[in-house]
Amino acid sequence: MITRFLIPLLALTLSGSLCAADSAPETRLKASVNQVVTIAKQAKDRTALITAVKPVLANILNFETMTRRAIGPGWRQFTPDQQREAVHLFTTLILRTYTAKFTPGESPSVEYKSCASPSPGRVEISTTSLYRGNRYDVVYRMEDQSGNWTVSDVVIEGVSLVANYRSQLDETFAQQGAAGVIKSLQRSVADSK
């Protein structure tokens, strides 16, 4: 399931679009995607790839918002230290899982199909990604954070990355609290090496 969310992040390259030419969110998404694709093609190994793409992804993906939403209402019961640790672990998990799916030299592609604004300060960019002969419908949910558009969720074939993690972490939080969520994320990170 996680592979379906991460392949499109790898698979993006520039293509045509139905969004306005001056669409700040789409322009920002495309620029970040181009950087990641270039870095990924040049990386010699997974460690180098993680190191190089982390600042680019941290600039476009809002890991704090994604982590908070993946944890859900229980987030408010986390201490500030637990919140920082959860964001760090979630970020590491996404980066490791993402880079594990990359094969150097491949040239995945994406078609930018449309932009929609479900509410002020929010945009959904619909795409179709083609990777290894498979086609994926991908929607990037972006939010305006004080003039800086960031991705707050990725929806693959109708399934939200944030909702997928939330379905896993809700039960853990209900049974074991914040400490249990941290331990679950630690295990997932350890398993992703």
Which residues fall in each region the model found?
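Low-complexity, intrinsically disordered terminal/linker segments enriched in charged
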Residues: 153-193
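N-terminal signal peptide c-region/cleavage motif recognized by signal peptidases
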Residues: 15-20
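Short beta-strand edge/turn micro-motifs at domain boundaries
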Residues: 135-163
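N-terminal secretory signal peptides that target proteins for export/translocation
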Residues: 1-2
